[in-house]
């Protein structure tokens, strides 16, 4: 029996159940084990709780032998490698885009100036402010039902959340608008899940590897290398989106390339720096590094230091 560690939220257990069911379909009995994390036990902002708020307890459960593997929302994993563990599988990614849910079924551009928009993410907040719509951004915590209820109750006019979460819980009918990544660059690895286990457990690594999707792994690798090179945590105002796309060479032959777009935003929305690049899936890490270097050359370091200062002051 493969014991799969997961947070206890409905979204987390739904994601983990996809992995469990895939393992069972492949002939490997599996079960879910709920692990409480610091992020689930605190109502403080994610930014204030620090790196690994949703993942440290799951990794500890693996190390202590309480579970054999853990399922993470990949965007929650620290970018620094931990040699004790390996991401043995990255299943096919769900839609990585952000989605808007409004009380009056308006799209974002139709919301009146001064509308209250909730988000848990400095990245979303910064990019929303950069749109220049005069929206009032409010902090947002809690599970997905809690967040949606803040709109239906009239507490907020709108929220911006990951479309993937709504899809996994069968709540896409709540979506008013799905934001184009050009308008709102998603978080690195948004919509992807990571299945992690002990690095030395070669048998389990091989079993889990059957669930891996090569295109998803290439995309999130490029995105997370960019994030790591910027030395920005998962709560930083950094966006990145990569995808495998088809291109045609000079002789009309179709081939695949990996494209990557990244951005760094000032928290007040006064500036957004963007860069992009294209390479092959086999050079995903090099692509992430190259786009990060371009962002640095355009002034990303100064913009991020300003964002860190703003967060330290509580603005």
Swiss-Prot record:
Q: How is the cofactor bound?
A: Binds 1 dipyrromethane group covalently.
Species of the source: Mycobacterium leprae (strain TN)
Query: This protein is called what?
Result: Porphobilinogen deaminase
Record-level GO BP terms? protoporphyrinogen IX biosynthetic process
What top-level class of enzyme does the UniProt entry assign?
A: transferase
Oxidoreductase in keyword set: no
Q: What InterPro entries does UniProt report for this protein, alphabetically?
A: HemC, Porphobilin_deaminase_cofac_BS, Porphobilin_deaminase_N, Porphobilinogen_deaminase_C, Porphobilinogen_deaminase_C_sf
Other observations noted: The porphobilinogen subunits are added to the dipyrromethane group.
Cysteine-cysteine disulfides: none
Which superkingdom heads the taxonomic lineage of this protein's source? Bacteria
The job of this chain, per UniProt, is described as: Tetrapolymerization of the monopyrrole PBG into the hydroxymethylbilane pre-uroporphyrinogen in several discrete steps.
